[in-house]
From Swiss-Prot:
Species assigned in the record: Photobacterium profundum (strain SS9)
Name of the featured protein: 3-isopropylmalate dehydratase large subunit
Binding site for [4Fe-4S] cluster: 353, 413, 416
PANTHER family assigned to the protein according to its UniProt record, in alphabetical order: 3-ISOPROPYLMALATE DEHYDRATASE, HOMOACONITASE, MITOCHONDRIAL-RELATED
Recorded family membership: Belongs to the aconitase/IPM isomerase family. LeuC type 1 subfamily.
Domain of life the protein comes from: Bacteria
């Protein structure tokens, strides 16, 4: 079905309607896809499918590939992450060469995590439809684009046709009213949102994030929020573009220039929800109540403020939540009624498509400066791209991290997921700036706590979680 034809539309409905290529009676509409981002893990079978059917990539100018999931963060050696990783990366290189697709490979100055390089290169622009064979494609929605993850068969379909069948989703508005307190980050905001909606609260919806606390965010902060839209079950998350967006986009490699940029801004400024447009669901949070957040369980909705006690089954009314809490506490090795700061951590991971941009590096370095990583902790800082790495090194952030005892690594997805050499051992506890704390996500039987970069850096130095609002006391 197509979006409503009335005068008042949501941002999502405007972008969706603008991309309907074919709307046959009784069928899901076919959407045109503006950008297709490709990486080494979900693309091999898709290219094989093209080859078997004698097809070409329809729009090589709108298709961009990189290596990120499997890459080693310690060396540029393609063999370093094992045989499967090597095969996937070599296959991507072969496929991109054969089909004429732009590839930012291991040794390219633009290599990095796909959801970091898209925005920083100006590949991502407002009002676009953007897909990738990766669940955190929602990141690009920070620009007011409709961005979502797709499966491998859909990757093949987009490569071949530059289109995708897509039904219209339900709409949800999540408004964060007012201003956050000092030191509260985009990561804290989105974790607080998921804590309220639960990890399934957005299922079947496309979410628009709005409110003063959202528009106050930088583009990098907005990307963190939209990145985790999938973690409340949503198909995608969008934020309306504004002057902050246009200033970020200007002068990037693939951004429009001159009169074309001015014309683009004129169009982009129409990409906002109309007065009178209705949403299927509305969620409201008061920004001033948001504190530094830490997950305690095995989904991102199992989250508390750092100064709260770990909940137990008795804190929940629904039996399914009681059972889930009991199981999560057992897996995480936690005890209800205690504080998260009572438990030592083993590893810290600052990186991922959620929090590996230059502002994240700066926030972590500000905490690390003049401090030392605790003796019981291994702490990794993994920039999201070669561009982020170069900028951080230009600012001397790498030296701050190394001096404090952090490991300064090469760009890649790293310890977000156990697909390379960066992973947790059984029962190791990790403060992570990534987006998923599922069982085994960072390594078999590993225990993941999701936090902001500042909270992760503080935990690394203290050896356990601390409230960054009390930081002077925390490192004494």
């Amino acid at each position: 079905m197509s979006a409503k034809t009335g005068t008042s539309k949501t941002l999502y409905e405007k972008v969706y309607d603008a991309h309907v290529a074919v709307a046959a009676e009784g069928e899901n509409p076919i959407l045109y896809i503006d950008r297709h981002l490709v990486h080494e893990v979900t693309s091999p079978q898709a290219f094989d499918g093209l080859r078997e059917k004698g097809r070409k990539v329809r729009q090589i100018g709108k298709t961009f590939a990189t290596m990120d999931h499997n890459v080693s963060t310690q060396t540029k050696d393609i063999n370093a992450s094992g045989e499967m990783a090597r095969i996937q990366m070599e296959t991507l290189a072969k496929n991109c060469k054969e089909f004429g697709v732009t590839l930012y490979d291991l040794n390219h100055k633009y290599q990095g995590i796909v959801h970091v390089i898209g925005p920083e290169l100006g590949i991502t622009l407002p009002g676009m439809t953007i897909v990738c064979g990766d669940s955190h494609t929602a990141t690009h929605g920070a620009f007011g684009s409709l961005a979502f993850g797709i499966g491998t068969s859909e990757v093949e379909h987009v490569l071949a046709t530059q289109t995708l069948k897509q039904s219209l989703a339900k709409t949800m508005k999540i408004e964060v009213v007012g201003k956050v307190a000092e030191g509260i980050t985009a990561k804290d905001i989105v974790l607080a949102i998921i804590g309220k909606t639960t990890a399934a609260g957005g299922t079947g919806y496309v979410v628009e994030f709005c409110g003063e606390a959202i528009t106050d965010l930088t583009m990098e902060g907005r990307m963190t929020v939209c990145n985790m839209a999938i973690e409340l079950g949503a198909k995608a998350g969008l934020i309306a573009p504004d002057q902050t967006t246009y200033d970020y986009i200007k002068d990037r490699k693939f951004s429009p220039t001159g009169a074309n940029f001015d014309a683009a801004v004129e169009y982009w400024s129409t990409l906002k929800t109309d007065d009178g447009a209705t949403f299927d669901a509305v969620v409201t949070l008061d920004a001033k109540n948001i504190k530094p957040q830490v997950t305690w369980g095995t989904n991102p909705g199992q989250v508390i403020a750092i100064d709260e006690l770990i909940p137990g089954p008795d804190n929940f009314s629904e039996q399914v939540d009681k059972t889930s809490a009991e199981k999560a506490l057992a897996y995480m090795g936690l005890e209800a009624g205690k504080k998260l700061s009572d438990f030592d951590i083993d590893k810290v991971f600052i990186g991922s498509c959620t929090n590996s941009r230059i502002e994240d590096m700066r926030a972590a370095a500000a905490i690390a400066k003049g401090r030392k990583v605790a003796a019981n902790v291994q702490a990794l800082v993994v920039p999201g791209s070669e561009q982020v790495k170069a900028q951080a090194e230009k600012e001397g952030l790498d030296k701050i991290f190394i001096e404090a005892g952090f490991e300064w690594r090469l760009p890649g997805c790293s310890m977000c997921l156990a697909m390379n050499n960066d992973r947790l051992g059984p029962k190791e506890r990790c403060a992570s700036t990534s987006n998923r704390n599922f069982e085994g996500r960072q390594g078999r039987d590993g225990r993941t706590h999701l936090v902001s970069p500042a909270m992760a850096a503080a935990a690394a130095c203290a050896g356990h979680f601390v409230d960054i609002r009390d930081l002077d006391n925390a490192t004494a």
